[in-house]
Design a protein with these regions (language model features):
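Proteins enriched for Cys/Gly/acidic motifs involved in redox and nucleic-acid/cofactor modification
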Residues: 1-143, 187, 193, 197
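Conserved SAM/AdoMet-binding glycine-rich loop
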Residues: 14-15, 23-24, 127-210
Length: 210
């Protein structure tokens, strides 16, 4: 797709952004058709990076090392024209290191959004007519494990349920381990929660998982 973009318009600026750029930086550097390489946690700086490129026209790679601690990259949503459902990302990264998965290397370690930051975004969207909120993350079950205190995903959901204008709350993919009796009981007390789960089941084969 990157090569096709350059072929269709030789003067276009081609930027590889996200997971591929994060894990394949050295390979992309060898490709003369790629002008910019922008990894995860630098997406919010896309416009300044492009402006810098247009000033000097130098090929560049903006890729942070996510193998150690780094801050959550906030990409806030202010308005959703003619939509009443919003996807709210509350967490990034994963510490699981499953044998078949590249996510911890591409997305880095677990980084959770501050709870008040999440609630502030939801309040703003609710004021603008959003009524349904889908809570997502790369490994959303781990929300809060890297923050000070003992607040986790269920605590966040309970607080979202208190926000005026929120009619429905849904969850993105979960790992089965989080579905405990206490977790389900507390969910039952959140009237807006839609009573179904999407569980991530990669494989039932021990040999594959090893």
């Amino acid at each position: 797709m990157l090569h096709r973009a350059k072929k269709l318009n030789p003067d276009t600026v081609v930027a590889a952004v996200g997971c591929y750029a994060q894990v394949g930086k050295e390979e992309l550097k060898k490709d003369p058709l790629i002008d910019l390489i922008i990894g995860n946690n630098k997406k919010k700086d896309l416009i300044p990076i492009l402006e810098k490129y247009f000033e000097g026209h130098r090929r560049d790679a903006e890729v942070l090392d996510l193998s150690s601690g780094s801050e959550y990259e906030a990409l806030h949503v202010r308005h959703l024209n003619e939509h009443t459902r919003a996807y709210i990302k509350v967490q990034d990264g994963c510490n699981q290191f499953c044998s078949y998965c590249i996510i911890p290397y591409a997305r880095g370690r677990v980084r959770s959004r501050d709870m008040e930051d999440v609630l502030s975004e939801i309040r703003g969207l609710a004021r603008n007519g959003c009524r349904e909120f889908v809570i997502t993350g790369i490994h959303v079950c781990s929300y809060g494990t890297d923050l000070d205190g003992d607040k986790g995903l269920i605590d966040l959901l309970e607080e979202i349920g208190k926000v005026g204008g929120v009619d429905r709350i849904r969850l993105g993919s979960l790992e089965p381990g989080i579905i405990t009796e206490d977790f389900v009981k507390r969910l039952q007390s959140i009237e807006q929660f839609c009573p179904h789960f999407h569980l991530s089941l990669q494989s039932g084969c021990d040999a594959t998982l090893k």
